[in-house]
Amino acid sequence: NADPGFFDYILCKLAPSLARISTKMKGRAMCEVYGAFGWATGIPGIYDFDLEEQAPHIVFTPYIKALAAELTEGVTDPMEKARRFYDFITKNMSYTFMPSYFLLENIPDTCACNYNGDCGVFALLFLTLCRCAGIPAQWQSGLAVEPDFIGCHDWVRFYVEPYGWMFVDASYGVSSMRAGNEERRQFYFGN
């Protein structure tokens, strides 16, 4: 068994070097590091934590479990389950700016009950529903860049065989729905 302190030390020492490596290479390097510690599920790029709760924000509460079950009743195909989660969010939610997440409790439950949130809140709800349904999902964060705007943005990627990792941007899906652009809303699922 590896010493966790050694692992933390190595990651701290590697971080500056990894920052200079392309995003793809950095992802591969981290997968190899994590995989070397036995955290891999057997599918390349998927780890146990891609299916687990991660308190305080990714929690399978009774409400989330019931919502996931209701939305996927009679469905066995993981892609269709993910599609139903996306449709629920994009067809029902409204975009609202949120305070800092550390001030919020139970973000996915609150979003599902109040029908509003921002990009990160929608991402957390989609991610939590996917994981609750046994679909590996990972948080993604970066910048949204437009000709006259640059800002932080969050989305999710989820894994379904045989397609591999696919992206979902529920926030842009919500905006597309509100604008009446169904083709664009569909685009933000799986692309």
Q: Can you say where each PLM-predicted feature lies in the sequence?
A:
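Acidic low-complexity segments
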Residues: A2-D109, C113
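Hydrophobic/aromatic-rich core segments of domains that either
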Residues: V121-N191
